[in-house]
Amino acid sequence: MKDTQFIAGIAFALAALAPGYAVAADDTPYEVAGGNKVDKITLEGWRTWRALACERCHGARQEGLVGPPLVESLKRLSKEEFTQTMLKGRPEKGMPNFDGSKMVTENIDGLYAYLKGRADGAIQPGRLEELK
């Protein structure tokens, strides 16, 4: 009887934890299929990345040049830290601020989603398409 209660307790605990795993998956700021098909917001983030020519400092694959490798940085930075860096810059390190850029302020969520997807290895480098 005690074994049955123990197993039932374990099953209950695992069932209670399962929704937490689903929530974590739902917290992903992007949707991607096949490595290059992404949701509309993430696609706008990629377009913003390209329009601002961010690859001049961070590399075409976000692996860094004179600027840091964003595929590593976005593994550590929270969305709030990323937003703060984009809007305020890091002048001491050569990172300009973009708080006056309408393109950035309107697409900051998409830019974060794109770079986070790259850092997570879910989004492949190169041209993206909209996920339909």
Where are these regions (language model features)?
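N-terminal signal peptide c-region/cleavage motif recognized by signal peptidases
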Residues: P19-G20
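Bacterial N-terminal signal peptides that target proteins for export
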Residues: M1-I10
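N-terminal flexible/basic segments that precede or flank functional cores
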Residues: M1, A24-A25
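Gly/Gly-Pro-rich "capping" loops immediately C-terminal to redox-active cysteine motifs
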Residues: G35-R47, R56-N97
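A broad, structure-centric signal for solvent-exposed, well-ordered loop/edge residues
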Residues: A8, E55, G64, L77, ...
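Short hydrophobic/aromatic segments of transmembrane alpha-helices and their interfaces
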Residues: Q5-F6, A53, P91
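Flexible coil segments in periplasmic/lumen-exposed cytochrome c-class electron-transfer proteins
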Residues: A25-I41, A51-L52, K93-K132
